[in-house]
Regions:
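C-terminal nucleotide
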Residues: 1-86, 97-132
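Conserved glycine-rich beta-strand-loop-beta hairpin in the small C-terminal domain of fold type I
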Residues: 94
């Protein structure tokens, strides 16, 4: 429940780009590769590798300043028991998601709850929307 403004986060990214053109370009290219890799990994159902790509993405976001102290703490907790963890949304609030397997699910939920974070589990639907 962290108050934030998506607009302020977008401004933060634009400011980073303005001050660090080469680094922003490098990170953008790396991110494009992460996206391509994840699309392949999803088709192959390779959860651990997807988790590693999530962690890479999170590093890139942190490099451009899309995080805060609370998110950083949540990320550290999630990394202990998951394949990967990253912020979701614009990055200024307090929302992340972690990718784990069934055997670690209850442990990771407990860890977050012990730290007084709201959390819930969701399953990935690989089938997607199915019509007749």
């Amino acid at each position: 429940n962290i108050e934030h403004s998506t607009q302020s986060m977008v401004s933060k990214v634009k400011e980073f780009e303005k001050r660090n053109k080469e680094e922003f370009s490098r990170l953008s290219n790396l991110e494009s590769q992460v996206i391509e890799d994840v699309l392949k990994l999803i088709k192959e159902n390779k959860m651990q590798e997807i988790g590693r790509k999530m962690n890479q993405n999170q590093e890139y976001l942190e490099n451009i300043g899309i995080s805060n102290k609370e998110l950083t703490n949540m990320i550290k907790i999630g990394q202990e028991l998951s394949f990967g963890v990253k912020i979701t949304g614009s990055g200024g609030g307090g929302c992340i998601f972690a990718l784990t397997n069934e055997s670690n699910l209850q442990n990771i939920l407990k860890k977050f709850k012990d730290e007084n974070y709201e959390c819930f589990s969701a399953k990935i639907d690989f089938k997607g929307l199915n019509t007749f």
